């Protein structure tokens, strides 16, 4: 499994953000995956990146318990985090984020959860807008398996998280040692197809399968 996780981080860094020598890397990952820090550090060093800055995120149940209706503290925390990220926009930094696919929370705390999400939305928009102003900022967002997500998808499995990771590694190609090369070939093929379509200057395209019809 450790080898596959190394392959996965390799894909994230070399394909997702395509980190270059002497670049800063800002990584946002769930707190339950803090163990990936060692792999990020190792891979970044191999790719001659400058430094890795980490932000570990709690799930919503943890946040609701931690802040308990005192959401101004959470607001202040995200304000500080966002200010740090904004300062990195001018420092040749690339940004990688792995989010929880589905995040568990108590249904009875739905209103409190919405308050947390509104605070997050405010600072996410602030960072995104500033990133657009600066331009040419490389960032990559993805999802990462979690226990609750696995239980939702594989309710009959005895070890649903293991099953989800098995599928996830197949989809990301991290179960191949040459995953980066495979991804790059796929990207090149897509770019060649786009180039071909541009050259043909089609006025419209029609795509049809047994279940789908698409007209562009």
Residue ranges and their predicted role:
Residues 1-216:
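Active-site bordering "gate/hinge" segments
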């Amino acid at each position: 499994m450790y080898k596959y996780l190394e392959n996965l981080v390799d894909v994230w860094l070399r394909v997702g953000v395509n980190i270059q020598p002497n670049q800063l890397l800002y990584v946002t990952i769930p707190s339950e995956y803090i163990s990936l820090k060692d792999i990020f550090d190792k891979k970044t060093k191999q790719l001659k990146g400058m430094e890795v800055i980490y932000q570990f995120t709690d799930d919503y149940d943890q946040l609701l318990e931690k802040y308990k209706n005192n959401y101004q503290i959470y607001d202040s925390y995200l304000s500080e985090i966002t200010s740090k990220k904004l300062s990195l926009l001018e420092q040749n930094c690339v940004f990688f984020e792995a989010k929880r696919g589905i995040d568990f929370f108590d249904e009875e705390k739905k209103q409190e959860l919405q308050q947390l999400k509104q605070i997050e939305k405010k600072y996410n928009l602030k960072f995104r807008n500033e990133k657009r102003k600066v331009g040419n900022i490389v960032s990559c967002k993805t999802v990462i398996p979690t226990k609750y997500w696995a239980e939702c998808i594989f309710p009959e499995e005895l070890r649903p998280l293991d099953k989800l990771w098995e599928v996830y590694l197949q989809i990301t190609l991290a179960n191949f040692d040459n995953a980066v090369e495979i991804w790059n070939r796929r990207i090149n093929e897509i770019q060649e197809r786009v180039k071909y379509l541009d050259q043909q200057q089609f006025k419209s395209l029609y795509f049809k399968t047994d279940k789908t019809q698409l007209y562009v």
